[in-house]
């Protein structure tokens, strides 16, 4: 697949006026996302506007990369790119500005994102439903990694869920193809990827020759969040994020992570010493299932070479013990409104460890979001 990566072309673009915009559902550095419907068929879609203002040399490389990748990836658990549209080109356009129209990526519409669902205290996931969410998420990662693509921005807001309960990995704006290092020459990918709270320790230490384990760390953060209802490590800076990781996963040392001292930043940063690994201990107040705790623990391994991959994760006992994964459709059918992070109140953050849940007998997956602040 990687061989075909640079040869993909996208065909003639229709005008975006064929769609009627209904509501804005997303905003970020990438641009805006709108819910829309096809004027003739009524089909609901999501329109992702490509920001062009700062592009002096033509079409943004990040958008081009996203389009090429999404044309190659076709899987039930990956968002589907329908087409690329543009605004009407001015009749006065010439050879120099004929491409200045706004470009939109058109996707199948998904009613929710996971961050929006977790922000709503009325949305209660059972253990079976959490298993289904994580099974679909890991299936999506298995597929993209098998096809030599890294997502590089795993977070709850980039996990979409349809009204029928089908999960879709979304926002491939930071994604890229990867390959094994050639002729002993390491890859030199940018490490300025992945939202800080979900960024793995190898990227924070400056690694540029990385691979699928960076996405699995994000999957571990998301899995824990299914119970805590908010991101588990909310650092303010890269140094702070590494400190939070050390406090949860244990001190970063060559004993637990061979050759970690090769990183220049490892010598420069003041990392916490003498920290014990406490992933299971800190999460057991929220996560009562022992298999779930064990899988989170294996996903949040400091050394990327020892971190569990998507194939082994899908074969973990968590997915093959009672209660088995169950469909989300019935639970979602009780919620008529779409839920997106952009439309939800700001996710709370604070500087202290929250109190233990008051009622331990209650299902931790169904605990009211208002009881928690930052977890770690």
UniProtKB/Swiss-Prot annotation:
Location, primary (coarse class): nucleus
Active site: 153 (proton acceptor)
Enzyme class: transferase
Catalytic reactions on record: L-seryl-[protein] + ATP = O-phospho-L-seryl-[protein] + ADP + H(+); L-threonyl-[protein] + ATP = O-phospho-L-threonyl-[protein] + ADP + H(+); [DNA-directed RNA polymerase] + ATP = phospho-[DNA-directed RNA polymerase] + ADP + H(+)
GO molecular function, one term: protein serine/threonine kinase activity
Quaternary structure and interacting proteins, as annotated: Associates with cyclin-T to form P-TEFb.
Protein name: Cyclin-dependent kinase 9
């Amino acid at each position: 697949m990687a061989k075909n990566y640079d040869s993909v072309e996208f065909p003639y673009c229709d005008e975006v006026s064929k769609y009627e915009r209904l509501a804005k559902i997303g905003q970020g550095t990438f641009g805006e996302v709108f819910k829309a419907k096809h004027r003739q068929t009524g089909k609901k879609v999501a329109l992702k506007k490509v920001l062009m203002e700062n592009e002096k040399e033509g079409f943004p490389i990040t958008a081009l990369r996203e389009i090429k990748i999404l044309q190659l990836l076709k899987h039930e658990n990956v968002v589907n790119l329908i087409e690329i549209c543009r605004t009407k080109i001015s009749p006065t356009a010439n050879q120099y500005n004929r491409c200045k129209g706004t470009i939109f990526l058109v996707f199948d519409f998904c009613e929710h994102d996971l961050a929006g669902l977790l922000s709503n205290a009325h949305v209660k996931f059972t253990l079976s439903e959490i298993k289904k969410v994580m099974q679909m998420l890991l299936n999506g990662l298995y597929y993209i990694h098998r096809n030599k693509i890294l997502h590089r921005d795993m977070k709850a807001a980039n996990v979409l869920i349809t009204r029928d309960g089908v999960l879709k990995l979304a926002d491939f704006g930071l994604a890229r193809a990867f390959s094994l290092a050639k002729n002993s020459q390491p890859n030199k990918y940018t490490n300025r990827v992945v939202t800080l709270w979900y960024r793995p320790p190898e990227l924070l230490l400056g690694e540029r020759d990385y691979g699928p384990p960076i996405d699995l760390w994000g999957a571990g953060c998301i899995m824990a969040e299914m119970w805590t209802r908010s991101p588990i490590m909310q650092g303010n800076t890269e140094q702070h994020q590494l400190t939070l990781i050390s406090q949860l996963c244990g001190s970063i040392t060559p004993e637990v992570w061979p050759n970690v001292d090769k990183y220049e930043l490892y010598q420069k940063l003041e990392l916490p010493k003498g920290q014990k690994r406490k992933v299971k201990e800190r999460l057991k107040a929220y996560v009562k299932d022992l298999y779930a705790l064990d899988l989170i623990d294996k996903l949040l391994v400091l050394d990327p070479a020892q971190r569990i991959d998507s194939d082994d994760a899908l074969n973990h006992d968590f997915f093959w013990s009672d209660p088995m994964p169950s469909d989300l459709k019935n639970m979602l059918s009780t919620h008529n409104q779409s839920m997106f992070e952009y439309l939800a109140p700001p996710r709370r953050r604070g500087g202290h460890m929250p109190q233990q849940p008051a009622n331990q007998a209650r299902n931790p997956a169904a605990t009211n979001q208002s009881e928690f602040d930052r977890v770690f």
